[in-house]
């Protein structure tokens, strides 16, 4: 369980993740140690701009560069697909995640407003405490 992590009931279901990977087959990554997945990142683009989603590393595998390597691999894949800008959303309460992005030199954007319009009310977000 990842603390401060938001999971959507439909988008983040097995079927939702499979659909995302079918649309972006070369940009999402997993980290494997001793035959088990210890980290993962969903990464996709629309041909212009990319987004990173659900970057996570199991707690007992953190501080070993796994998250950083996952991000680097995704950025390399995006560059090879001629993508020049990547966005991500880190929830304010996800202190660990926000520190991670800052440590990698990602820029906090205070010049934009983030909006969303919900098309499916059943696709609810549940946060891990």
Where are these regions (language model features)?
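Conserved GNAT-fold acetyl-CoA-binding loop/helix
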Residues: 1-21
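A short helix-loop-beta-strand connector motif used in the catalytic cores of GNAT acetyltransferases and
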Residues: 18-30, 51
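Conserved beta-strand in the GNAT
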Residues: 30, 36-44, 51-54
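A short, internal acetyl-CoA/4′-phosphopantetheine-binding micro-motif in the GNAT/acyltransferase core
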Residues: 32, 55-62, 90-91
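A conserved beta-turn-beta hairpin within the catalytic core of GNAT-like acetyltransferases
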Residues: 44-53, 62, 109-112
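Conserved acetyl-CoA-binding loop-helix of GNAT-fold acetyltransferases
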Residues: 54-57, 63-76, 99, 103
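Conserved beta-strand-loop-alpha-helix junction that forms the acyl-donor binding cleft
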Residues: 59, 88-97, 116-119
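Conserved GNAT acetyl-CoA-binding A-motif
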Residues: 78-90
């Amino acid at each position: 369980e990842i603390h401060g992590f938001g999971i959507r009931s439909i988008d983040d279901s097995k079927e939702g993740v499979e659909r995302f990977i079918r649309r972006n087959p070369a940009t999402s990554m997993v980290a494997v140690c001793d035959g088990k997945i210890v980290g993962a990142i969903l990464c996709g683009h629309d041909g212009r701009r990319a987004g990173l989603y659900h970057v996570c590393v199991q707690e007992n595998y953190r501080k070993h560069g796994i998250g950083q390597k996952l991000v680097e691999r995704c950025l390399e894949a995006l560059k090879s697909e001629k993508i020049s800008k990547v966005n991500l959303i880190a929830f304010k309460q996800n202190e660990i995640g926000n520190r991670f992005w800052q440590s990698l030199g990602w820029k906090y954007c205070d010049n934009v407003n983030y909006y969303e319009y919900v098309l499916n009310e059943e696709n609810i977000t549940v946060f891990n405490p």
